[in-house]
């Protein structure tokens, strides 16, 4: 993953003047099923204090300078501070989809960081983030399935699109395991769960093929 490592090195070097206390990877980069050129780079940076206007500007400059780097479009980073890390509902400064926004660090992400987070710099997640109670994790996963995904089930037009089929089915499989067993699984592991939930084997294999394909090359479904 030479391009991935080069981008991470550039990002860490650019962030160094902000004196981050920690930088972590979560998602596929930490879970071991990252595919260079297809998977996103999901990061969390812990700054000494909540970013004020000047720090927000410097974060924007950093990410804009990285725009021309290979894979930079998939680099997402949320910025925490020790004073704000405890609140799972708080919205934090985030760079995602090539723009600044604010969003929370969900119980799923927090649990991922504790179980499989990859330390790129500084302190480990356990030194900054409180553990996620089992009830809080299960409640969030159930709410996400019920309030976000369930209303889309009746939108037949969406389910002819690869991204909805892939993400929807994998998310449902992962949620099912979390609710039944109280643990998180990766997208790769979710593929093995799908047949037991009634997913057609042909669709599962198509998702598996797409998940391991280079984003720049066409897959069977013409991505």
PLM regions: where:
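Catalytic metal-binding acidic patch
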Residues: 27-61, 65, 74-81
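Short, solvent-exposed loop/turn segments at secondary-structure junctions
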Residues: 30-31, 84, 174-177
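Conserved NTP/Mg2+-binding pocket subregion across the NTase superfamily
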Residues: 61-161, 169
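Hydrophobic alpha-helical packing segments in soluble, helical-rich domains
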Residues: 153-188
């Amino acid at each position: 993953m030479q391009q991935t490592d080069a981008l991470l090195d550039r990002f860490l070097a650019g962030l160094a003047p902000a004196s981050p206390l920690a930088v972590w990877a979560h998602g596929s980069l930490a879970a071991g099923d990252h595919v260079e050129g297809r998977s996103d780079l999901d990061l969390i940076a812990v700054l000494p204090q909540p970013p004020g206007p000047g720090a927000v500007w410097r974060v924007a400059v950093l990410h804009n300078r990285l725009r021309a780097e290979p894979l930079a479009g998939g680099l997402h980073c949320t910025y925490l501070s020790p004073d704000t890390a405890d609140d799972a509902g708080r919205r934090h400064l985030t760079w995602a989809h090539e723009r600044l926004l604010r969003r929370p660090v969900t119980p799923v992400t927090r649990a991922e960081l504790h179980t499989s987070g990859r330390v790129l710099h500084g302190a480990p997640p356990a030194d900054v983030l409180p553990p996620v109670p089992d009830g809080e994790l299960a409640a969030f996963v159930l709410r996400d399935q019920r309030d976000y995904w369930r209303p889309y089930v009746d939108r037949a037009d969406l389910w002819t699109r690869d991204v909805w089929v892939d993400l929807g089915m994998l998310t449902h499989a992962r949620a099912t395991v979390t609710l039944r067993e109280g643990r998180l699984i990766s997208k790769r592991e979710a593929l093995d769960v799908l047949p037991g939930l009634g997913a057609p084997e042909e669709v599962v294999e198509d998702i598996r093929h797409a998940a391991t394909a280079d984003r720049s090359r066409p897959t069977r479904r013409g991505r």
